[in-house]
Amino acid sequence: TLIFLVEQEEVFMIYLDHAATTPVPKAVADAMYTVLTEEFGNPSAQYPMGQEMHRRVDAWRAVIAGAVGCEAKQLYFTSCGTEGDNWAIRAACWQNRHTGRHIVTTAVEHHAVLNCCQQLEQEGWEVTRILPDRNGDISAEAVLAAVRPDTALVSVMMVNNELGNIYPIADIARGLKAINDKTLLHTDAVQGFLKVPFSAKTLGADFITLSGHKIGAPKGIGALYIGPRVRNPRPLLPGGGQEMGLRSGTEATAQIAGFAKAVELRCDHLEDKLRHMAEVKAYAVEKLSAIPDLHIIGDGKAPHVLSVSMAGWPSQNVVTDLGSQGICISAGSACHQGKSSQVVAALHLPKRVAAGVIRLSFGPETTFADIDACAEALRNHHDRRMPML
């Protein structure tokens, strides 16, 4: 349970939307404050304060790279996951532009991937979108069956942000090497980083997208892993040559400091935190399954994401009602609110079920009491209101 201020009054809040964003721990805010107010040097400056900040950025990069399982020189800071996704897709297409103009992705990707691919279609590229099965799963076999000699890129997310399904990135990587070793592989790991164990060294992806604010870092900072098979990647932003010449612009040093501190905090007793989130999720499934007309959606194995539907009760009404009681859940991806979910649409659920899908997502701070309160509020919503669908 968290406390926040609304018009200077303390309001108790049960936060169950960690897949949208996460609370920033005080230690992260303190690390950022120090950089903002005392250690504010430009890393490109040649005087001692600038050179010291350059060393600090290198050290922070190494911390995050260690958690990713890659070399520091393979990790490039970005402003967000959306930027990383777009950069990876464009860089892969640029490298393979002379050997093929075909992309394989899925119908349940984040809109950063879907819309970038749609833009490339308008530029003459062909895109194949793999549909999930009825449980929301994407098999490596289905992805690999779509790969052709002219496939430049395969882009498949690591963890679905609405369902929590984990997709077989390592299996796809191994299959690609046998089918077409020129095809590059990108995975959006925004919902997987420090929630699903992986190492860039063994995963096999050529690009891995990360976002800081999903693990307790501030908004406005992310990173992109670029592997050794990517030759001379095209710079995202030409300019002063920051980020090893690939993403120019003065580094957001405070955000980078916060990102590194958040990684340190999350990695401390990480297995215990993941086990706790998995236990909270299992408890939520048990409690919510007892509510009439409530369905568990998907087959998500990630420990922090759970989608359910109260069939007949519109999701936005449920979200608004619980929000008025201080319980924060979502009606889908918070990155694309106001439009119907492409993930839910791809499952071909009955209309009454699809219109009632809500997402709960958990963090290390989520308690069993939080789940009890949410379950009670959902049951009360069901009992007080007649179905509208």
Per-range role (PLM):
Residues 3-389:
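Pyridoxal 5′-phosphate
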